[in-house]
């Protein structure tokens, strides 16, 4: 299956206007984490927080709604969110942890959960995955933003990917775009051997593709994920639509997912023939 196993798919957005102002697309991840903290379902969450270095991101343990909101928005540079899970346990003494990550990070988390030692003294209460085609190093991002878009890293407000382009928004209202074909040389090499676009091992996966502007596409994959979404809807913090009732719908998600699988499976075969490391 191009999306992996899932129970249902929906289009959704947060009902909180402050979240929608700050968050990317429908603001689902921020809304889910804030709801979890306020309802005591979660003690803390691992997030990719903003830094002072323009588009760069760094992993952080967020324990308040304010910290979650400050970390809102898509990040296209690598943020090793899994690395702060030890901090969540040892430094913050958290027991109910929410985790969000890219497909490769979700795979690592699932392996950690199944490892005999597991998350010692900690319950990975919910694992959320982000749709991801590829990611960039900070140096690669800097080249895209400054050399192609002509905007200083310190002046970047946010970045986004859509309609075949990489978009850069400055703090001063400038909006520049870069053709995606010009960004490929700056992609992380490890992204070229990943065949997972929709975070297939998460409890809940989300991304903008498939939904209208301002909404998020969500794959509910597990009973744990289904229960979490239902609680959010009942609490009035999330509004949803049937994915079949929106455009462009799952056809576009399927197209991109299959593109990633087919392209990167060929790369894996080529690397194996050359004796280079491959994931399987």
From Swiss-Prot:
Molecular function in Gene Ontology: coenzyme F420 hydrogenase activity; flavin adenine dinucleotide binding; iron-sulfur cluster binding; nickel cation binding; oxidoreductase activity, acting on CH or CH2 groups, with an iron-sulfur protein as acceptor
Reactions it catalyzes: oxidized coenzyme F420-(gamma-L-Glu)(n) + H2 + H(+) = reduced coenzyme F420-(gamma-L-Glu)(n)
Family annotation (InterPro entries): Co_F420_Hydgase/DH_bsu_N (IPR007516), FRHB/FDHB/HCAR-like (IPR045220), FrhB_archaea (IPR017679), FrhB_FdhB_C (IPR007525)
Pfam family, one: FrhB_FdhB_N
Domain of life: Archaea
Entry keyword annotation includes Ubl conjugation: no
Cofactor(s) named in the record: Ni(2+); iron-sulfur cluster; FAD
Enzyme class: oxidoreductase
EC id: 1.12.98.1
Assigned keywords, A-Z: Iron, Iron-sulfur, Metal-binding, Oxidoreductase
Keyword Cell wall biogenesis/degradation found: no
Free-text function comment from the UniProt entry: Reduces the physiological low-potential two-electron acceptor coenzyme F420, and the artificial one-electron acceptor methylviologen.
Family (UniProt): Belongs to the FrhB family.
Assembly: Complex of alpha, beta and gamma subunits.
PANTHER family, sorted: 7-HYDROXYMETHYL CHLOROPHYLL A REDUCTASE, CHLOROPLASTIC, FORMATE DEHYDROGENASE SUBUNIT BETA
Protein name: Coenzyme F420 hydrogenase subunit beta
Organism annotation: Methanococcus voltae
Taxonomic placement: Archaea, Methanobacteriati, Methanobacteriota, Methanomada group, Methanococci
